[in-house]
Structures are given as C-alpha cells and as structure tokens.
Amino acid sequence: MKKKIVHPIVLAILDGWGHTNIQQGNAIKIAKTPTIDSLIQAYPSTLLAASGQEVGLPKGQMGNSEVGHTTIGGGRVIQQELVKIGNSIVDNSFFNNLELNEACEYANNNKASLHLIGLCSNGGVHSHIDHLLALIDLADSKQVTNLYLHLITDGRDTSSNSAKYFIKIVADHIEHKQFATISTISGRYYAMDRDFRWSRTQAAYNILTSNNSIKLNASVNYGDLIDHYYNKGISDEFIPPSRINLGSIKDNDAIVFFNFRPDRMRQIVQAFVQKPFNCFATKPLYNLRVVTFTNYDTSLNTTIAFHPHILNNFLGEVLYKYGLKQFRVSETEKYAHVTYFFNGGAEEPFPGEDRELVSSPDVTTYDLSPDMSAELVTQKSISAIKKAIYSCIVINYANADMLGHTGKLKETIQSIETVDRCITELLDAVSKLNGTLIITADHGNAECMFTDEGNPCTAHTTNLVPLILIEGEQEAISGHGGQVKLRNNGSLADIAPTILDILHLKKPPEMTGKSLIINSRYETRNIEKTSIEL
C-alpha cells in the first residue's frame, strides 16, 4: 500500500521579530536578510497586532513570548494574568483572595514571617510592581508582624539600569510600615533562570535562606549596593544575589511568589517545595506555607492564588481531534512556548503531537553565541518535514528575541542573518513536499535596539509583527485562480483560524479569531469545510 504523503503547514515563529520603518537601531532592517526580503516581495504578507488589548493585555502593554504563543495557539484573545490580577486590585477582590489572606494568617499564627519574592518592575511580562504594592497593603491590613521583601531586579523588560527607580517606589511605600523590610536583592539572571543552570538558582536560594551578607566597602543599602555593581559594569539583570537586611526564610514561614508568569519561577520554587530535591544542597526547612500567584507547574506542591482559565480547543487539541499529526520544535529558551503555552497550559502533548527539544548553547549571555542553536532547530525541522506525516509543524527561532535582550546591535544583526539562512533551508524542504510555510513572530524586540536617548534598549516593543504566507500552489487555496490575498488589521489570534482554513477544517466556536485569507476557496466557492464534534 502506497504511503500517503502529507503536505505540511509549517509555522515558523521568529521570536522578537517586530516591524518598524525606522532604520536607526533596527537590527532587522540593518541585517542582510535576502530570503525573507524576497518572500515579502513575492508572496502574500501582512502585519499583525501582537501587543496590548489585541492579545489580552492592557492598552499599550508590550507583548511577550508567553502571551504571543498562547494567543497564536488559542486563536482567540485571552485575558492575561496581568489584566486579571490588576482588575482584582481595582475592584478590591484581590484583598479578599483566600489563599493570600491565609498566607498572612499562617505567618501570624506561627509567630513567623511572611516573605514576598518576585520581579520588581513595571515590565508587565513576568510581574508588575503594582501587584507587589498591593501585597504589602494586604499584609498591613492583616497586621503581619514581620514582612520581608526579596526583590528581583529586571533589566530585560525594562531599561538595564532602572532598578533603583523601582526599588525606591517600594521603599517609599513601606517607609512608615515598620513591619516591612527589603531583605535581599538579586538579578533575574540568577533568581529567574529557566535553563537548568542550577548554580544560578542556588546562588539566589542561598541568599534567601541565609543571613550572611556580601561585604562591601560601602554601607549596605539598596542604592549603594546597586551603584557598587553599576560601577563594575554589572546591570540590573546580573546583580549577584545580595543581602541588605536580616530576614532569611526559616521554619514555619509563609512565602508568596508574586510573578504571574510561571516559566522563570519554577526552578527557585522547586528548591523550596520539591522533596527530594537533588539539583543542589538545600537547607532543611519545615512547615513552610508556599503560595504562587499562578500555577507554575502541576508537579509543584504549592497553593495557587489566581487559578488559571480553563482553555479548550487550542490549535493542538483541534488537530488531534481531527486525527492529524503535529510536531513542535525549539531550543531550550523557547521550548515551553511552542509546547505548554501554545497548548494553552497543557503540560502533556496530545496524542499524535511529537516534540523535539534542542539544547541552547551553554554560555553566560547569548551575545557570545549569536547563532544559538538555530541551525540544529532547522535540521530537526527538516527531518520532521521529510517524514511527510505531520500536518502542522510549529518551530520557534529564539535568536532575535534573546539577542535583542542583550542590547548588543552587532551580535543581534548576526543572529538575524542566521535565521534568514535557516529560513532558506526550511523553505526548500517545505517546497519539495508542496507544503505551506507561514512565517510570523510573537512580539517585537530586535527592531528597536536603542532608546530615544541612545541607550541600549533590551525590552520588547509594541510594534506590529509580519506574517508571510508561502504556498507552493497559491491557486490551491485561492478562490479566483490567482494568488491568495491577506487582509490587514489582523492579530496573532487570527493565525490558528488561518491554518485551519488552509487545512479545510472548521474552527471551533472558542476560536474567535478569523482567517487572514480574504479569498479562501472555501468561502468564495461555498465549499463546506470538514467538521467534527469539537
């Protein structure tokens, strides 16, 4: 029996690849990208909203990888945790949150301490400083006796030297609250590692659980501490874990981890709650009450303050229900995004969903290896394409985002040129199977490498992102015998419906996004799409 050849749809997500016509500091425009440039000229393309309300964030809030992949995979706008928690503060339901109130009461009943741990900035990607301030107010209202703040400095989703600004907001907020103390400071490089570089996590853990201080010539207050590292060329992200006041975590204490995004909190939380924990030596701590803002991982024994939405019929689930095979591939930095987030928070793959994890380079920062593992990701993708069994292949290229975060223009340009070469190889493999290649991005970053003042810009942007549709036979999905046309004013929520449109599959009612194809053969010829009970 002759094997059936599947003509795949390959979705290549170029992480951090935004669009702007501004040339200065635009690594994407400066880079030589002959393949992508030629594809934009030769094939249908459009620009998509990837930030703000179009992806379930507050108006004007930059997009990010978690939100981007969730929106792409979901085919709908989902209210994000940043908005959900922010709204709860506005309507005061935050202060009635059972789990947060119980954490305060636990500390009081045990004559112990409450510890708040999280990223201290207004970046809105992993956390928000407003949530921290609300937690402090809640602790005040519950008459917590000892409140210790363990602040993680940002420098990626905010400017690289903004830590003092944000910590001052916190310091001013607790100035007349004698029960509250800023205890430790740590750069996110250490406290928020997600790549199993356990020595970084260990450094953060040790400072949280020990009252030993890093000795400095200057007096230890947050301003002096940060200036000490600035003078050594160390920016916010890389500030070593440092203690500035007493307040280590002890038996019977309560801890609230207030990041709402899970991926960069899992390792540090594991060190406190996972038994046995074998990644590094930990301090015996008993009777801790650990609360996380959101569900960081189903395997972690924590109390969850804000329970997740129940999300059904994401693209992966729909493909599974139609009996189609799919493949996901990325390197370590973005693996969770093409799997967990793309599937709406489902940890396990659906039947028929294969996954491939490619290790990211073992370097301190990615400007030391701008190519990252893009070539190996490409080879794994091509191998999957050649099998001719997958109807949908989802790939993430991490380069533009991870290099954009370094603020290094030259290295970011190199990384973008690497991705362009990889797209050349990918396109050749897709074309040989008469498949469809969709190139898009989850948010902007590398197109804006400098601030208006000329300083390095390491944060994401609110810019639109491109989408290019390369179909071997455009007439196959066009309703008028010519090239496919794509509409404007779309968003990331429209990508999954577009994929289902090309596959001639009916989208589920949960997918409120709409196909980007204007002249789909199914609409112009009134052809009924394949449908099953979803």
From Swiss-Prot:
Classification via CDD domains: iPGM
Enzyme class: isomerase
Coarse class of the protein's main subcellular location: plastid
Residues the record lists as binding Mn(2+) 2: 15, 65, 442-443
Involved pathway(s): Carbohydrate degradation; glycolysis; pyruvate from D-glyceraldehyde 3-phosphate: step 3/5
Chemical reaction(s) catalysed: (2R)-2-phosphoglycerate = (2R)-3-phosphoglycerate
Cofactor: Mn(2+)
Gene Ontology CC: one annotated term: chloroplast
Keywords attached to this entry: Chloroplast, Glycolysis, Isomerase, Manganese, Metal-binding, Plastid
Intracellular or extracellular location(s): Plastid, Chloroplast
One of the GO biological process terms: glucose catabolic process
GO molecular function, one term: manganese ion binding
EC numbers for this chain: 5.4.2.12
Active-site residues, Swiss-Prot/TrEMBL: 65
Cofactor, how bound (note): Binds 2 manganese ions per subunit.
Binding-site residues for Mn(2+) 1, renumbered to this chain: 401, 405, 460
Residue sites binding substrate per the record: 126, 156-157, 188, 194, 261-264, 334
Chain's role: Catalyzes the interconversion of 2-phosphoglycerate and 3-phosphoglycerate.
Protein family according to the UniProt entry: Belongs to the BPG-independent phosphoglycerate mutase family.
Protein name, UniProt field: 2,3-bisphosphoglycerate-independent phosphoglycerate mutase
Lineage of producing organism: Eukaryota, Rhodophyta, Bangiophyceae, Bangiales, Bangiaceae
GN (gene name): gpmI
